[in-house]
Amino acid sequence: MSLKFQKLSGLVLCFLIALPAWFLGQSFPLVGAPVFAIFLGMLLAIFYKNREHTEAGIAFTSKYILQFAVVLLGFGLNLSQVLTVGKTSLPIIVATISSSLLLAFLLQKWFKLDVNTATLVGVGSSICGGSAIAATAPVIQADGDEIAQSISVIFLFNILAALIFPTLGDMIGLSNHGFALFAGTAVNDTSSVTATAAAWDGLHHSNTLDGATIVKLTRTLAIIPITLGLSFYQVYKTKKVGKNQQHTVKLKKVFPMFILYFILASIITTILTALGVNPIFFTPLKTLSKFCIVMAMGAIGLNTNIVKLVKTGGQAIVLGASCWIVITLVSLGMQHLLGIW
């Protein structure tokens, strides 16, 4: 069987996993399509052992379709609009991201956790959940088990945030503006930010959803410096190894070019919008990006050892809980310092 046919067969398989996961995600946005895709892939992997006809396509989807999805994510970012509307939230965003990443780094060292899993949980918790994990995973060369663990942890605390935060905000007396900032800076995934803000609006007959979404988009911009920083760190490590082994390392081979394409897509979106192009024009690209992420998560699920995931998932959950609590406290603390709450 030719390699092209193997790739096509694997792509079709991942598409068939992504399709029901996509519709399940639409029906249950708190869970989200990527989580459904991972679990469907893991369930199928229990029975689907002989993969010689699809292995190449599964590997292609988990790597290159994921990178393609990240590039398309850039078409959802109008840099000027996000920076203009979201600049009031920048101090809170910087504080929450910094504290979460620092905590993830310290806990990884303290408890000797897996470096990649700690990085993905830290980035996913502090920036934008599954999208940040999708952008970061190829940069640090994370494997399927590490990605699946991280996505699962993010999913758990997304649900908790959507269930708890509206009541918590009510109890501590947050204003509508304050809750929009809280939801946008302390909830991981965009769909969960939407669900959390919608729950608040249902209780208060308000409209915090737009504000929370803009704050969330502003927070998403942190993908750029974080992934670039991790990229240069990976280059540094690779060069160090290459020097020890007496061979040179070419920057182009280890630097993830898809991150630069992501930035380029964001710049194109910003320029075209400034020239009068309707933002609706980019909606199909954003939707395609989300679906490609779901396909990639299905492929990752197929390559994930569910037994290992269950056995080693405890550490990731503790790390995720720690990051989630710190982000919540820092978000509220910064609002208090800034006189918003």
Curated annotation (Swiss-Prot):
A Pfam family assignment: Cons_hypoth698
Organism: Streptococcus mutans serotype c (strain ATCC 700610 / UA159)
Gene Ontology cellular component annotations, sorted alphabetically: plasma membrane
Keyword Transmembrane: yes
Similarity comment text for this entry: Belongs to the UPF0324 family.
Protein name: UPF0324 membrane protein SMU_2059c
Annotated localization: Cell membrane
Topology of the protein relative to the lipid bilayer: Multi-pass membrane protein
Regions that span the bilayer: 7-24, 28-47, 68-85, 90-107, 120-142, 147-169, 178-200, 211-233, 254-276, 291-310, 317-339
Chief location category: membrane
Keywords: Cell membrane, Membrane, Transmembrane, Transmembrane helix
